[in-house]
Amino acid sequence: MGKIVVSENVSLDGVTQDPTGEEGFRHGGWFGQIGEKDREAWAKMELDEALGAEALLLGRRSDEWFAARWLSRSGDWADRLNSLPKYVVSSTVEEPRWANATVLTGDVADAVSKLKQELDGDIVVYASTQLVRTLMEHDLVDEYRLLVFPTVVGEGTRLFEPGRARAD
């Protein structure tokens, strides 16, 4: 059985919104506040995670974001991400933008539960906050890998919103 692994970059106060500053969020770009040594360690962790993954699971916006940036890149990490099977959850997309991708439609919980039954390894979810919240609501997340950045953003989209069900 596959395992859903949520891998997120988060600030100290839990914000996941616009870490690179490319989405127009006024507090975006907090990812860039780490030093070169930390960036190298982060890149190694991300590569190791990608090498250990069987597939990626993404929401529509994350598929679009990643495809726009990764399709033209090369190197160990880019090559691995581009070659991994990808599953994009969407009610509007017919053709995902990133290569080697399949669209999952219909009931999200049912589609992801079926995917977990079909695969054996880690199914890594990058970004995709709305999708992650849906997965949490249906108790489909098996593991959280949160890379906490040493900054307080103050406002923005948080992975764990107040009043949400407990995530174990």
Please name every model-derived segment.
Residues 1-168:
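Enzymes that bind and transform nitrogen-containing heteroaromatic metabolites
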